[in-house]
């Protein structure tokens, strides 16, 4: 199967690197314009040629649009929901006992190693590192929500 796909790709290489059509200079001056050009101009080999051919002409003007993140902006409610979701997925936490104000060690019966694993899961979820000095102070979900909101500048 892979051999057939590779052979098909190799057979298409000459047409992929064939020279592009020659266009009138007037058409090349317009960025990304739709242009009609005469059939006697050169096009890729094997392409059918009607009397007039419609083509997209790339120009020198390029509009760049950067999308840094597809995620919606963070809100306090969104942070709280994500924190509780991650905690509910943790196998040592009973979801019925979990609330925003549950203390990890007193209410949920976790130890310090579990607390470190929770902080690591929060780092993965929110995409930034929580220093050990700050991580030691985060003992309940509400403290984690407040910390993340402070670091991500969410005050809604």
UniProtKB/Swiss-Prot annotation:
Q: How does it assemble?
A: Mammalian complex I is composed of 45 different subunits. Interacts with ETFRF1. Identified in a complex composed of MALSU1, MIEF1 upstream open reading frame protein and NDUFAB1; within the trimeric complex MIEF1 upstream open reading frame protein functions as a bridging scaffold that interacts with MALSU1 on one side, and with NDUFAB1 on the other side. The complex interacts with the mitochondrial large ribosomal subunit. Interacts with alpha-1-microglobulin chain; this interaction is required for the maintenance of mitochondrial redox homeostasis.
Task: Give residue ranges for domain Carrier.
Answer: 77-152
In the database record, which residues form the transit peptide? 1-68
Task: Tell me the GO molecular function terms.
Answer: acyl binding; acyl carrier activity; fatty acid binding; mitochondrial large ribosomal subunit binding; NADH dehydrogenase (ubiquinone) activity; oxidoreductase activity
Q: Which Pfam families match?
A: PP-binding
Which positions does the record annotate as the modified residue O-(pantetheine 4'-phosphoryl)serine?
112
Instruction: Provide the protein name.
Output: Acyl carrier protein, mitochondrial
Which keywords does this chain's UniProt record carry? Acetylation, Electron transport, Fatty acid biosynthesis, Fatty acid metabolism, Lipid biosynthesis, Lipid metabolism, Mitochondrion, Phosphopantetheine, Phosphoprotein, Respiratory chain, Transit peptide, Transport
Name the InterPro entries on file: ACP, ACP-like_sf, PP-bd_ACP, Ppantetheine_attach_site
Q: Which cysteine residues pair off into disulfide bonds?
A: none
On modification after translation, the UniProt record reads: Phosphopantetheinylation at Ser-112 is essential for interactions with LYR motif-containing proteins.
